[in-house]
Amino acid sequence: MRVVKLVEISELKTGPFGTQFSANEYVIDGIPVINVKNIGYGNIIETGMGYVGQSTVERLSDHRLQEGDIVFGRKGSVDRHCLITKVQDGWMQGSDCIRVRITDSSVLPSFVSYYLLTDALKAKINNSAVGSTMASLNTDILGDIEINLPTYEEQCKIANILSSIDSKIENNNEINDYLEQKLRLLYEHMMSNVQTGGVTGHNTIASALTDIITGKEDANFASPAGKYKFFTCSNDTLRCDKYVFNASSILIAGNGDFNVKHYTGRFNAYQRTYVLMPGRKYYGLLYLASLYQINSFKSTSAGSIVKFITKGDIENIPVFIPDNEEVLSKINHLLMLQEQYQVENDELAALRDWLLPMLMNGQATIED
């Protein structure tokens, strides 16, 4: 085991800024640019991805990303980073990022990425960041981070077992994306047939199917090691120590990007999050009706200033209930499949997070 500073095994480079790269160089479709909002914990968040043309990437070729690069954000949640895989090779580093490129052939980039995800290292990065109002990271702070390096063979073993768990999680996410597409197609097909008279039923509104409840907690209620899920207006789901709700529920963000989620189990909710618990029969149907109504609300209000969704907006979500209950059963079946895969992912993530520090500090070893 040897201890090295990150700067000793890598090249650190900040993204292009100032006169090098301007916002008007972004295009609708092109080569993806990784900015702070696209950086998760070891992964890339593709929602809201920006794009630039080939000529921009060629001009700023020093900022072209390669497989194995590790990318941090310079501001905000500075303990987050993403590892560039073969899929993202050739993408561009954004202005507000720091790229770490491993230059030591005895160091495995994926091992370093996992090492940087340990709670101890994330806390060290957060504590080292500068700035009174917003945490800020620079190459000096990042380069000073110490890494405990086992042999290259041991690095490979550790990274392989952790990445196998992440691969299973990613596979489940892809299945859930497919199930979400099937759900939406099924709902759109039903609503299309309603217009032509091919499907009969009756119209109602959300408040006829369920009470509309809001969470009571503020953001400080979150606890990273909490046992229960804590739903806020963010796309990310947090954890907390106490639950209030225990049912199949639809959760609608009352501000922010107005996202719609569903979950079965014990949880708590932020004060601007609406909780709908319609019972199992109409669970999937109300989820889809809410999803499409909120998306419609967002698209019709584009360009105007909409700070929040009111309880009245939620109460009046239109819901068509088909006479054929087989449709409801199909929707619920797909929705519950999604939740089963998500439960498996939660268990896999917990296993990975339990193994991670133990493998890194030598408490657990991998036999051949």
Residue ranges of model-derived segments:
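Short, conserved secondary-structure segments in the cores of folded domains
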Residues: 61, 87-88
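Extended, non-catalytic scaffold segments that flank or surround catalytic motifs
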Residues: 3-44, 109, 115-118, 126-127, ...
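Short, charged beta-turn/beta-strand-edge "cap" motif at the junction between a beta-strand
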Residues: 76-80, 258
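Non-catalytic DNA-recognition/assembly elements of restriction-modification systems
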Residues: 1-17, 144-234, 323-367
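Sequence-specific dsDNA recognition surfaces
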Residues: 7-23, 37-70, 206-247, 256-275, ...
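A short glycine-rich beta-alpha junction/loop motif
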Residues: 90-98, 130-159, 269-271, 303-326
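Short, positively charged
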Residues: 110-141, 277-313, 318, 367
